[in-house]
């Protein structure tokens, strides 16, 4: 009603309807799609200091955490070459300074070597989750308040950023024995969705 969401209607595959009335509604969708679909007023990002009156709050309330499309690499052992195909629009400079072993023409490299960078995401079975924020596979963008076609283009950009980082690890960092593990039932072998 107006600028307040007082519940929701759900329709299942049998065309049965369930109506839920609520005093308080929390949008639990990944990207706030329920409130947007309802036409309700909502905020995204961190609270602006002008709103919260907190001195330590940021001034830009549209700051949204970067999205990451995680991947799992497996160490296939010395001599293995698991190098993936060069991703479309690959740009190695996006990954410069990700660690001390990487080229770093401007600024300072993140203060770990390539092995420690992979160790950050180590999981059992000689596998490594690739989720590296420092010049790695974090993807900056607003995936909220955009139409489905533009959102899918942006999400494809995030997938390509992760594939590019994997390619960089394998080629520029010389770690070609680390290949995509067969962990996810997806064509690209990346996680089913970003976080």
Please place each PLM-identified region on the residue numbering:
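Flavin (FAD/FMN)-binding glycine-rich loop and adjacent Rossmann-like elements that form
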Residues: 2-7, 11-195
């Amino acid at each position: 009603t107006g600028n307040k969401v007082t519940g929701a209607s759900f329709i299942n595959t049998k065309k049965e309807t369930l109506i839920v009335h609520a005093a308080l509604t929390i949008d639990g969708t990944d990207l706030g799609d329920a409130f947007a679909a309802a036409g309700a007023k909502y905020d995204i990002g961190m609270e602006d200091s002008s709103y919260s009156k907190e001195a330590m709050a940021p001034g830009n309330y549209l700051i949204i955490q970067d999205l990451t499309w995680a991947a799992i690499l497996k160490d296939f052992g010395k001599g293995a070459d698991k190098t993936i195909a060069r991703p479309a629009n690959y740009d190695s400079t996006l990954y410069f300074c990700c660690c001390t072993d990487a080229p770093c023409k401007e600024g300072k490299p993140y203060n770990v070597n390539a092995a420690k960078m992979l160790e950050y995401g180590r999981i059992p079975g000689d596998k490594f989750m690739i989720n590296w924020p420092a010049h790695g596979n974090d993807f900056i963008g607003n995936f909220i308040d955009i139409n489905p076609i533009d959102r899918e283009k942006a999400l494809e950009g995030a997938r390509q950023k992760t594939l590019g980082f994997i390619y960089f690890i394998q080629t520029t960092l010389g770690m070609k024995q680390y290949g995509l593990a067969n962990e996810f039932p997806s064509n690209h072998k990346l996680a089913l969705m970003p976080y």
